[in-house]
Amino acid sequence: PTHATSDMNMAEDRIGPERIRGAYAWQRFRAQGTVIAAGSDFPVESPNPFFGLHAAITRQGHDDQPDGGWYPTQRLTAEQALRAFTLDAAFAAHQEKSLGTLEPGKWADFILVDRDIFAIAPQEIWRTQVLETWVGGVRVFAR
């Protein structure tokens, strides 16, 4: 999703006013039954997943621009965005039986963060910090 907010200043000039309406059109895709799988787009974009969640939910840069978001009807909800980065990304990689959710029999890869992204202002999500990282049920990082 960060590529949308990175591209918003030049995308319409490059692909035109007609085609831009179908670009980055996440809610339109969802309405047609498309699974939206999200990732960081690293190395072109930051690997920080909270930058991507912020972009998907607000469709704004870190400066809160543009007002209301770029093509705001295409914003994802926080729940939709988190699913795109977890279960739907695992589905896209044909790994949904072992990744994407915390369930018995799955790998138990997860992070603990310093805030509840569902309880804060969407414009603050990109500031989220990881406190712990767990891989296969083992803590591998602690702040």
Task: Show where each model-derived region lies.
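His/Asp/Glu-enriched, well-ordered alpha-helical/loop segment
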Residues: P1-A119, Q123, T128, E132-G136
